[in-house]
Amino acid sequence: MNVWIIIGIGVVAIVGVCYAIYKRKINHAREQQRLTLTQNISHELKTPVASIRGALETILMHPDMDEEQRRQFIERAYQQSGRLANLVEDISTINKLDTQTDFYTRLQLDLHTIVENVLQDLSLRTTQAGATITHKIPKHLIISGNYTLLYSIFHNILDNAINYVDKAEINIQLTNQDPANLYFSISDNGPGIPTEALAHIFERFYRVDKGRSRKAGGTGLGLSIVKHAVIFHDGNITAVNRIEGGLEYQFSLARRSK
């Protein structure tokens, strides 16, 4: 009997030690994640802040600057302030999705209406970029979800395609549905992305083309928000290069939250 008691105590002790090691590793991983995120945020903030400061310093140091030059520097500062505002907003969204998911309430929503609203809001940029967007989302496609996050899913993916594909032809489709889930595809006619990048494009601050991404005004958080928003709706998302060319996002959304 004493032998079994000793064995039992030993097993409990081993389990306790293993759990403590596991928790330590988890806490270390979280701390490393927070540190990396802080470093990335600091790095991303430097560019717009430096640009704004540089433009304003130039104006202050040259009070006799002609009006046209002054206007150009003011416009540059204004554009960078917009980028800074977008970055702060995206960081806030990511933080809420990480720690305050109850912040986002769910309602019965029509996905057709949401997609139409996204297309309307992107219409000017779509025209300026020479892009075309078509969709086959049926009317009255109801889902229990959060409007802001569902809007972000479609907006951020389309925004990426418009930014990085010349004269993009983008297609949005409801590819399948069952009693529990809706399945979507958003594809473009661009060159796709390197295969090794496919596994990373939903990571925070990951950029396939760093120079072009910053030039386009991206925050590096758009697709990470997409992934978090899909997970919030009990779905999954992947990106694949199409055989015929272009990038395709395939994702699912639960009709009703669990």
Question: What is each residue range found by the language model?
Answer:
Residues A161-I162:
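Short helix-loop "hinge" at the ATP-lid/N-box region of the Bergerat-fold HATPase_c
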Residues L60-E67:
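Short acidic helix/loop segment immediately C-terminal to the autophosphorylated histidine
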Residues I193-R207:
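Short conserved segment of the HATPase_c
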Residues Q79-A85:
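Short alpha-helical segment of the dimerization/phosphotransfer core of two-component systems
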Residues A168, D234-G235:
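Conserved glycine-rich
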Residues T99-Y104, I142-G145:
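Conserved micro-motifs of the catalytic ATP-binding
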Residues T105-Q108, T127, T132-L141, Q177:
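Conserved catalytic submotifs in the C-terminal HATPase_c
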